[in-house]
Design a protein with these regions (language model features):
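Basic, polyanion-binding surface patches
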Residues: 1-167
């Protein structure tokens, strides 16, 4: 059965569903850092602890991260809009140029952790499954950290980034 709508309509309607915003970071085969903004990060399982996300198949950033053994999902705060867009656009000057001027650290497994992130979820890559023009990346959580004092979480809603505060 063929869909009776185009991709613009699909995106517009699904934009009514708020999604969290993370920057998935990793290192390529040479150890150079890379990152990509993701709005499709999900919890998959508590036992074992699994998470997932859906990068676009054409993403150069994901192709660099996929060369490594893992990734770190950096949960952004509503104050980190610049970081959101920095990692959403194709970088000028190479993949690691996105990290220029950032005081980032390394997770226990060596993945980049962005400064001021609300949480960092350090994972090994379990599997990558094709899903249309995207892939589903399943990660096993190895380490977790949260910074409760940095602010409200960033969400993407109806084409814009905003924040959400716990009730």
């Amino acid at each position: 059965m063929e869909a009776n709508f185009d991709s613009a309509k699909f995106r517009q309607v699904l934009g009514h569903l708020p999604t969290g915003v993370v920057v998935v970071t990793g290192v390529d085969a040479t150890g150079a850092p890379s990152g990509i903004t993701i709005g499709s990060f999900v919890s998959v399982s508590l036992n074992p602890p699994l998470v997932g996300f859906f990068p676009g198949n054409a993403s150069r950033s994901w192709s660099h991260i996929a060369q490594g053994q893992g990734f770190c999902a950096n949960v952004l705060t509503s104050e980190q809009e610049e970081l959101c867009w920095r990692f959403a656009r194709e970088p000028e000057g190479g993949m690691s140029a996105r990290f220029d001027g950032l005081d980032w650290t390394k997770s226990p497994s060596g993945m980049p952790v962005l400064p001021g992130a609300l949480a960092a979820i350090d994972c090994s890559i379990e599997s990558v499954t094709p899903a249309g023009d995207h892939s589903f990346v399943l990660g096993r959580v190895q380490h977790l950290s949260a910074n409760e004092s940095v602010g409200e979480a960033m969400v993407f809603y109806r084409g814009k980034v905003t924040g959400v505060t716990p009730a």
